[in-house]
Swiss-Prot record:
GO terms for cellular component: membrane. Its main location: membrane. It comes from Arabidopsis thaliana (Mouse-ear cress). This is RING-H2 finger protein ATL7. Belongs to the RING-type zinc finger family. ATL subfamily. The lineage of its organism: Eukaryota, Viridiplantae, Streptophyta, Embryophyta, Tracheophyta.
Amino acid sequence: MSYSDPNQNPIPETYAPSNSTESEKLKLYQAFIFSVPICFTFIVLFVLYVIYLRRNSTTNVDWSSLGMRGGTFVPTNNNLSTAELGLSKDIREMLPVVIYKESFIVKDSQCSVCLGDYQAEEKLQQMPSCGHTFHMECIDLWLTSHTTCPLCRLSLIPKPSLDLSHQSTEIVSSIENSNGGEASTQPDSQSATEAISHTDDVEEGNRDSQEVSKETEENDRNSVGTSDGCCTCRLG
């Protein structure tokens, strides 16, 4: 048997260091990592919301007041709806239908909407304004949201004749007539001045001829007088 010595120093108990401080630091670090992307997403959403509000505020402008101030044409709601929605079904059905044949001269050999080739005896729909042809289903779907030809973008809606053009032509014609009247009066005045100058020239010519004739008569008289004097001298 072994007996413990009471004078022997007891061995001190060693305790492992606590990991409480490290665990707290790890939790704070994890919380920071998760909070950063969340805060970033909130900031991005807030910025997008502000941009959305600004766009709505700029689009919701009183266009009628702007049109009255600027004096420009402002499209009405009916014009916008027709431009956005395209042609009605009745108008689409009124478009001419053409049967495609290889011998028949057609501008296009394939549909510009679906890029599919035309087959013989296939029904196509033709644009009356430009003459381009398309598949009936393709052009019908296109014209539900557009009012132009999908190939050349020519509008199918006829433009209304404006009275301003008629008035402008009338104004131009009246101006031309007035200018023509002035031009007709100018030759008359010129002809009158030419006639007056011609009469003056004629009168001056007559005066010159009369003076010349008088001078010739005086010369003849002088010559006759000298000849008579010579004859008397000879006779004497």
